[in-house]
Curated annotation (Swiss-Prot):
Catalytic activity: D-glyceraldehyde 3-phosphate + pyruvate + H(+) = 1-deoxy-D-xylulose 5-phosphate + CO2
Cofactor names: Mg(2+); thiamine diphosphate
GO BP terms: 1-deoxy-D-xylulose 5-phosphate biosynthetic process; isopentenyl diphosphate biosynthetic process, methylerythritol 4-phosphate pathway; terpenoid biosynthetic process; thiamine biosynthetic process
KW Methyltransferase (keyword) present: no
Protein name (database record): 1-deoxy-D-xylulose-5-phosphate synthase
Keywords, alphabetical: Isoprene biosynthesis, Magnesium, Metal-binding, Thiamine biosynthesis, Thiamine pyrophosphate, Transferase
Presence of the UniProt keyword Transferase in the record: yes
Description of how the protein assembles with itself and partners: Homodimer.
Residues given in the record as Mg(2+) binding sites: D150, N179
Family: Belongs to the transketolase family. DXPS subfamily.
Lineage, opening ranks: Bacteria, Pseudomonadati, Pseudomonadota, Betaproteobacteria, Burkholderiales
InterPro entries according to UniProt: Dxylulose-5-P_synthase, THDP-binding, Transketo_C/PFOR_II, Transketolase-like_Pyr-bd, Transketolase_BS, Transketolase_C, Transketolase_CS
EC number: 2.2.1.7
Cited function: Catalyzes the acyloin condensation reaction between C atoms 2 and 3 of pyruvate and glyceraldehyde 3-phosphate to yield 1-deoxy-D-xylulose-5-phosphate (DXP).
Length: 629
């Protein structure tokens, strides 16, 4: 991407270059940086609103702090495109979130300026505190800064870190990037507190009174300090963060470099834990994103002159949409149903449910642990909770899943979106481990629908059970198998034979059924749609094993401990010996890229399956070559 239109930005190859610029030019640099972010994301897709909102803050941080010696830890990290551009990766932005290209999140392996890898929320304060105390032990005076959003601040982990940091005597700066907008609208008492603090007549009046108090203060140092604290107390009544032991500064305008830079310079010289409250606006500087920051949170490619345009041909229904429609239909049928989400209303397909059944919709904020135990409590009182959560985020509530739900055998349905590889978001968001970590829990079951129709049917089956059940389904469009309008389920724990072949049987779990069927045509193999990773349809498995010379399992999840392992365990328990090939995700983190290309690289497309099977078991008589897609 050409930098011809960005003359100042072209001169900044690292933060040292930025610090050499005259302060008077930093505003112009921020303007160029914002335009560069917009142009870049419009060509590659990615996170936009959050990055447009952190431009000035990023410029100010690199202008004031001696990065990378001073540590910047970005919470979540999807707002770090300006940071990447200023830290030597400007010319690689066209590769953003593409196979072999820049990650959309901070990665330690990508740059020394990415001091801590992030993508899940609310980890920054803990990490920055650890860095600060490690530096203190070595006698190093470096500064450590955590930048965290108001949505991420609602998570319990953030408060655990604040509680520790307030008494740790570390040179830690926590910057609250208060933009009143996580992916879904932020909820909870903390966000209400921040909103009240920043809105209405009280803040304006208190600010004016504070200025008046300071203006009229006698020129006595101690009295002036006392009055300053009183004035600050009037602006920020009983400041929550000061109760944690932090020196609270703010709120200040996060888009005003004339405020940001001197404030950060003053803070840099202070000892102990500091808390800076910065107010920003998501989508700042691009009117379309300012008006609809959710739509521009993570857009695909678009023309910035006209904005997002709906495709002329409606795309295939997504699994997320299938879930959202099922949730509304089941809620109409059963008034006991309640829907729970940890701050992912839009991403989990719950917008319509929220609109139609607001009294039965619960957004608990970025609080996965609380969401799961909250669901358990509701189930104890006769409600029928459905927890809509990304597979990767359920990892954060594993103890609650075991201790609070499964141990008590409570009928909670977990709708696990983003199961398997997720493409551009990469390893941090991959739902690679859910089969393995769910199936080992007593009382838990795990369904793996192969398409949109089965997704709706298996959600119904899960809902009808009197114990906890997880239903996993991938991100994005289905295969085009339209769901049936009724709410009929499928038999619990039962699979089906989809294709009869000879010698060899492929046992497919989830959406890899369809490439398995393609591969089977060339191999003349039997294909079984297993549907359930737990309970395994052992009767069908043993029948298929008796009729075939070799077995293959395919799953879009980790091989270790996954569905293939369940098949191996069942065969061993029955004393059945059959050659078994397990295909799935390896013991490695799969980085970002196009989902189809990533599956092909792992040998999980039709051609890859045929290749792996042939290499293991040899060519079959009359086998046809399967052309790679």
């Amino acid at each position: 991407m050409s930098t011809t239109n960005y003359p100042l930005l072209e001169r900044v190859n690292d933060p040292a270059d930025l610090r050499r610029l005259p302060r008077a030019e930093l505003k112009a640099l921020a303007t160029e940086l914002r335009a560069f972010v917009l142009e870049s994301v419009s060509k590659t897709g990615g996170h936009l609103s959050s990055n447009l909102g952190t431009v000035e803050l990023t410029v100010a941080l690199h202008a004031v702090f001696d990065t990378p010696r001073d540590r910047l830890v970005w919470d979540v990290g999807h707002q770090t495109y300006p940071h990447k551009i200023l830290t030597g990766r400007r010319d690689r932005m066209p590769s953003l979130r593409q196979l072999g290209g820049l990650s959309g999140f901070p990665q330690r392996a990508e740059s020394e300026y990415d001091t801590f890898g992030t993508a899940h929320s609310s980890t920054s304060i803990s990490a920055a505190l650890g860095m600060a105390l490690a530096a203190k032990q070595r006698g190093d005076e470096r500064r450590c800064v955590a930048i965290i959003g108001d949505g991420a601040m609602t998570a319990g982990m953030a408060f655990e870190a604040l509680n520790n940091a307030g008494v740790a005597d570390a040179n830690l700066l926590v910057i609250l990037n208060d933009n009143d907008m996580s992916i879904s609208p932020p909820v909870g008492a903390l966000n209400r507190y921040l909103a009240q603090l920043m809105s209405g007549q009280f803040y304006a009046k208190a600010r004016d009174v504070g200025k008046s108090v300071l203006k009229n203060a006698p020129p006595l140092l101690e009295l002036a300090k006392r009055l300053e604290q009183q004035a600050k107390g009037m602006v920020v009544p009983a400041t929550l963060f000061e109760k944690f032991g932090f020196n609270y500064i703010g709120p200040i305008d996060g888009h005003d470099l004339d405020s940001l830079i001197p404030t950060l310079e003053n803070i840099r010289g202070l000892k102990g834990p500091q808390f800076l409250h910065v107010v920003t606006k998501k989508g700042q500087g691009y009117k379309l994103a300012e008006a609809d920051p959710v739509a521009y949170h993570g857009p695909g490619k678009f023309d910035p002159r006209v904005g997002l345009v709906k495709p002329a041909t409606p795309p295939k229904q997504t699994f997320t949409q299938v879930f959202g429609q099922w949730l509304c239909d089941m809620a109409e049928k059963d008034e006991r149903l309640v829907g729970i989400t940890p701050a992912m209303r839009e991403g989990s397909g719950m917008v319509e449910f929220h609109q139609r059944f607001p009294e039965r919709y619960y957004d608990v904020g970025i609080a996965e642990q609380h969401a799961v135990t909250f669901a358990a409590g509701m189930a104890c009182e006769g409600a029928k909770p459905v927890v809509a959560i990304y597979s990767t985020f359920l990892q954060r509530a594993y103890d609650q899943l075991i201790h609070d739900v499964a141990l008590q055998n409570l009928p909670v349905v977990f709708a696990l979106d983003r199961a398997g590889l997720v493409g551009a978001d990469g390893a941090t968001h991959a739902g690679a481990y859910d089969i393995a970590f769910v199936r080992c829990i007593p009382n838990m079951s795990m369904a793996c629908p192969a398409d949109e129709r089965e997704c709706r049917q298996l959600l119904t089956t899960a809902y009808e059970q009197d114990h906890p059940v997880a239903v996993r389904y991938p991100r994005g469009a289905g295969v085009g198998v339209a769901p049936l309008p009724d709410l009929e389920g499928l038999p619990f724990g039962k699979g089906e034979v989809r294709r009869k072949g000879r010698r060899m049987a492929i046992l497919a779990f989830g959406t890899l059924l369809y490439p398995a069927l393609q591969a089977a045509e060339a191999l003349d193999a039997t294909v079984v749609n297993m549907r359930w990773a737990k309970p395994l349809d052992t009767q069908l498995l043993l029948q298929v094993a008796a009729e075939h010379d070799a077995l293959v399992t395919v799953e879009e999840g980790c091989i270790m401990g996954g569905a293939g392992s369940a098949v191996a365990e069942a065969l061993a328990a029955a004393g059945v010996q059959r050659p078994l090939l397990q295909l799935g995700l390896p013991d490695a983190f799969i980085e970002h890229g196009d989902p189809a290309k990533l599956l092909a690289l792992q040998g999980l497309d039709a051609a890859g399956m045929q290749r792996s099977i042939t290499e293991r078991f040899g060519a079959l008589p009359g086998e046809q070559a399967l052309a790679a897609a």
